[in-house]
Amino acid sequence: MRIHGENEISRSIDVNQENDYKKYVPQLREDFKHICGYCGKPEEVTTKGFEPDHFVPGRIDSSRKLDYSNLVYSCFTCNRKKLGKWPTENKDKPNDGKVGFAFKEYDTHLGRDKEGSIEFYTSVGEYMYKNAFRFDIRPMKEIWKISKLINAKENLFEIKDKLTSEELMKYLELDKAIEELKKILFEKKE
């Protein structure tokens, strides 16, 4: 299963140049479907917000600081874990066999198991999993579960006037499960 689930991330190509990379946030939110480009966390479950991350860090290539195609919509946690990490000191060489953050090949390196935990498939994925984003110590399964529960709750809410009493109970159970998972995410600082 893909880290981003059903969401297909695609960047807009004709984005006007801005004088501050933070001005790209509204467009990034749309292009990244309101989820983290690295871990797939939806905005609804974060306790710390989202921000643009420079895929190629500024210390490696300062000329790309305002380049929209170099920005990733990232949850606070992924952005802080990645920081200025880049596998090589060469801006044009994104992969020395240790890591590759490029989205086209992302799914070949990382994915999710049937429970929603992130897993790696390659040595590149292992580096991202254990070093770049520290998925090995983060509650990724819980994040996946809560996003699925929120989606189910939203679907039920859309037909709330037609729900049976049994379905209303399911709605309340979903709400309770979401609140319990939110507590876990807060405690884990996600």
Q: Which positions does each model-derived feature cover?
A:
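Sequence/structural segment immediately N-terminal to covalent heme-attachment motifs in c-type
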Residues: L28-F32
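Conserved phosphate-binding loops in nucleotide/dinucleotide-binding enzymes
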Residues: D61
